[in-house]
Curated annotation (Swiss-Prot):
GO terms for cellular component: transcription elongation factor complex. It comes from Manduca sexta. GO terms for biological process: transcription elongation by RNA polymerase II. Belongs to the ELOF1 family. Transcription elongation factor implicated in the maintenance of proper chromatin structure in actively transcribed regions. Zn(2+) binds at C26, C29, C50, C53. InterPro entries: Elf1, T_Elf1_sf. It is found in: Nucleus. It holds the Pfam family Zn_ribbon_Elf1. This is Transcription elongation factor 1 homolog. One of its GO terms (molecular function) is zinc ion binding. Keywords: Metal-binding, Nucleus, Transcription, Transcription regulation, Zinc, Zinc-finger.
Amino acid sequence: MGRRKSKRKPPPKRKAIEPLDQQFNCPFCNHEKSCEVKMDRAKNTAMIQCTVCLEDFHTTTNVLSEPIDVYNDWVDACESAN
């Protein structure tokens, strides 16, 4: 007599990786997606600037830095100033 075939569960579906945002809300004028980050990896610097109120912020970066890190540094600097 032969064995019964075992029913295997299908492999789990992988979740799609969502890319991180490149544009952010301005903490000064509260416009949505008005701040754009420009990163210069050669000089290890980054600048974020609002296209509406023209506020900007410069910071140093490292190899692992992403635009969201620059935005968080800007928000932290705003909170520490107040």
